[in-house]
């Protein structure tokens, strides 16, 4: 029996055939924080990604858009806080972040224009 962490072959193949438009839907924006800046020195980059994005999709999108080799992807979901808006309770949206580990020596210049 396979462990729940293993991705199916079909899921990996779907991720490899993603269109450029689908890649932009998976990766929403880079996350620029103090922690992300420190991690960039160790060949890691942090992105805000779609809430339903899988690790193989994130890996394929980063490799396809930025032309780098990805070693691994760690993800987390920040649950939206309950806040009050005009006296009524509301809910902020959940946010999914992806920590992407690149091959040593590679980096992504997030200030450059994507072609």
Curated annotation (Swiss-Prot):
Keywords of the record: Ribonucleoprotein, Ribosomal protein, RNA-binding, rRNA-binding
Function summary: One of the early assembly proteins it binds 23S rRNA. One of the proteins that surrounds the polypeptide exit tunnel on the outside of the ribosome. Forms the main docking site for trigger factor binding to the ribosome.
Pfam families per UniProt: Ribosomal_L23
Record keyword Metal-binding present: no
Key word Cell inner membrane present: no
SUPFAM superfamilies membership: Ribosomal proteins S24e, L23 and L15e (SSF54189)
PANTHER family: 60S RIBOSOMAL PROTEIN L23A (PTHR11620)
GO molecular function, one term: structural constituent of ribosome
Assembly: Part of the 50S ribosomal subunit. Contacts protein L29, and trigger factor when it is bound to the ribosome.
NCBIfam families according to UniProt: PRK05738.1-3, PRK05738.1-5, PRK05738.2-4
Single GO BP term: translation
Protein name: Large ribosomal subunit protein uL23
Upper taxonomic lineage: Bacteria, Pseudomonadati, Pseudomonadota, Alphaproteobacteria, Acetobacterales
Family as reported in the entry's similarity comment: Belongs to the universal ribosomal protein uL23 family.
GO cellular component labels: ribonucleoprotein complex; ribosome
UniProt-listed InterPro entries: Nucleotide-bd_a/b_plait_sf, Ribosomal_uL23-like, Ribosomal_uL23/eL15/eS24_sf
């Amino acid at each position: 029996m396979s462990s729940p962490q293993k991705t199916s072959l079909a899921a990996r193949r779907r991720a490899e055939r993603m269109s450029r438009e689908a890649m932009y839907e998976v990766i929403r924006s880079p996350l620029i924080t103090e922690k992300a800046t420190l991690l960039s020195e160790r060949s890691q980059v942090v992105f805000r990604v779609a809430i339903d994005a899988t690790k193989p999709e994130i890996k394929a999108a980063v490799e396809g858009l930025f032309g780098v080799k990805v070693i691994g992807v760690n993800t987390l979901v920040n649950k939206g806080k309950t806040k009050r808006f005009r006296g009524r309770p509301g809910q902020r949206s959940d946010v999914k972040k992806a920590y992407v580990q690149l091959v040593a020596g590679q980096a992504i210049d997030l200030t450059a224009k994507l072609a």
